């Protein structure tokens, strides 16, 4: 699964079929990666939620947890990873008028 903030919702999560979260949303989206079912929608959770992602019984495959494409950390069958939003905030610099949806529209149009 992909766990993304509003900023991350326009990247890998969007490519996996997840929704775009408004930049003012206080929460995260959890998007399945390549689900075997069409009935596996992304889910949005409030910022106060602590999410426990549990690794089931794994056959020959390994499960990794990674942050923003960094090197992964292996998780064993039965392991649980707790995911929650930090109280710390990162301020992003934008030049000119920042319009999240105009920027997304330009990104999507350039990929056609």
At which residue positions do the language-model features occur?
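Catalytic phosphate-donor-binding core of small-molecule kinases
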Residues: 10-112
């Amino acid at each position: 699964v992909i766990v993304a903030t509003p900023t991350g919702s326009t990247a890998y999560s969007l490519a996996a079929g997840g929704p775009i979260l408004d930049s003012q949303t206080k929460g995260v989206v959890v998007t399945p990666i390549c689900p075997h079912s069409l009935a596996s929608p992304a889910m949005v959770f409030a910022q106060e939620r602590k999410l426990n992602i549990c690794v089931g019984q794994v056959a020959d495959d390994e499960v990794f947890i990674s942050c923003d494409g960094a090197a992964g950390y292996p998780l064993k069958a039965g392991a649980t990873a707790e995911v929650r939003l930090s109280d710390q905030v990162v301020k992003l610099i934008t030049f000119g008028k920042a319009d999240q949806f105009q920027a997304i529209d330009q990104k999507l149009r350039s990929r056609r």
